[in-house]
From Swiss-Prot:
The gene is LHB. Keywords: Disulfide bond, Glycoprotein, Hormone, Secreted, Signal. SUPFAM superfamilies: Cystine-knot cytokines. GO terms for cellular component: cytoplasm; extracellular space. Glycans are attached at N52. Heterodimer of a common alpha chain and a unique beta chain which confers biological specificity to thyrotropin, lutropin, follitropin and gonadotropin. It is found in: Secreted. Promotes spermatogenesis and ovulation by stimulating the testes and ovaries to synthesize steroids. Disulfide bonds join C48-C96, C62-C111, C65-C149, C73-C127, C77-C129, C132-C139. Its main location: secreted. It comes from Meleagris gallopavo. GO terms for molecular function: hormone activity. Belongs to the glycoprotein hormones subunit beta family. This is Lutropin subunit beta.
Amino acid sequence: MGGAQVLVLMTLLGTPPVTTGTPPVVVDPSVAVVGPPLGLGGGGRPPCRPINVTVAVEKDECPQCMAVTTTACGGYCRTREPVYRSPLGRPPQSSCTYGALRYERWALWGCPIGSDPRVLLPVALSCRCARCPIATSDCTVQGLGPAFCGAPGGFGIGE
């Protein structure tokens, strides 16, 4: 595998704020818009925003994982579904993705001498609704998995 792997272990920490929903609004006869304008959440769904997540960080050469709490992007974005087939194709769909981010450096413990224990993790500073950047993101409905620590030593907590 090589390199560091970051796996989502837990999703939201705490209770997300709930927004009030609005019924679908038709902007153009060919496109139905679901949710409130500007990509905000709707129907009781939280809008696209930075959320706290706990991830499992591991490297092949280090015997244990480390649970790290960081900030990622999560929430709902406005979607458009065509009412009829347009010769121009389907409208682009947006997803909640990073607006601005920085990287934090973490050091794994228990790594053998001579190996690099450092891992860089992205931290969301802001989020936006945009087309999913497939070159840098997992744009699937479900992640590529597995959502657990693969190191034989686990987290080393209480073991």
